[in-house]
Curated annotation (Swiss-Prot):
Any one Gene Ontology BP term: cytochrome complex assembly
Cystine pairs: none
Complex formation: The 4 large subunits of the cytochrome b6-f complex are cytochrome b6, subunit IV (17 kDa polypeptide, PetD), cytochrome f and the Rieske protein, while the 4 small subunits are PetG, PetL, PetM and PetN. The complex functions as a dimer.
Functional description taken from the UniProt entry: Component of the cytochrome b6-f complex, which mediates electron transfer between photosystem II (PSII) and photosystem I (PSI), cyclic electron flow around PSI, and state transitions.
Keyword Cell division: no
Homology family: Belongs to the PetN family.
Name listed for the protein in its UniProt record: Cytochrome b6-f complex subunit 8
Any GO CC annotation of this UniProt entry: cytochrome b6f complex
Alphabetized UniProt keyword annotations: Chloroplast, Electron transport, Membrane, Photosynthesis, Plastid, Thylakoid, Transmembrane, Transmembrane helix, Transport
Localization terms from the record: Plastid, Chloroplast thylakoid membrane
Segments traversing the membrane: 3-23
Protein's membrane topology: Single-pass membrane protein
Length: 29
């Protein structure tokens, strides 16, 4: 595994997690 691939995967995880928090927050959960 190269460092760029790991960094890109980590970025996608953080982005997906933050987006989920925004959606849940607007849903009132």
């Amino acid at each position: 595994m190269d460092i760029v691939g790991i960094a890109w995967a980590a970025l996608m995880v953080v982005f997906t997690f933050s987006l989920s928090l925004v959606v849940w927050g607007r849903s009132g959960l």
